[in-house]
């Protein structure tokens, strides 16, 4: 009778027999009443079977639709020291259709090169789901040092444009070839 939420209806239709193990007919020999009209979502459903006509007595049974398990996993991220943090994201596994679960992501404080935990938090029970949260890691790598330009060997900006011998050149004391 019990079922795990799967987006489908789980309406239990009881089979009723008398003491001689004769199968009784719904509507003629007994009636069935349910405590709800929602047979899809998580909850406890009470079923009341009442004798009718030649049969008397009432029997009550309950069954449950229990939450489906969902996992939210923070995705690992990397950045170089001094850069802004990447956007924190997570993957959700186990929801059905367009269903969503709510959660918040944050990371352990710190900016030095190293590893920092990315935490994901939210309610454990969300509607039709029981949610498990899995942390990720932000790795901050060391920044490489830029040696810059050697002052003895200047690195002029090249534009790629062809230079012709200029007619208005001024002698600056250095040799120039065209």
Predicted segments with their positions:
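Solvent-exposed beta-strand/loop surfaces, strongest in extracytoplasmic domains of secreted
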Residues: 1-178
